């Protein structure tokens, strides 16, 4: 499990996870872009499900800090995330 904090305008960069991700927006406004889909705008209380291998990016589009808590289903020894150009 991890918590990520993003300042206004900050983004995660495009990346993938080798396993599923389940996230929860604690605070702020998140723009979630999943490759091949229209961007989604999420707010505090919203839940994120990311399938394994999906290319995605999270960006803080609000005026305050964005806080997201996530848990991942990964095989032992696999990296948490892999950047995508």
Which residue ranges define each predicted feature?
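Short, surface-exposed secondary-structure edge patches
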Residues: 3, 13, 22, 38-40
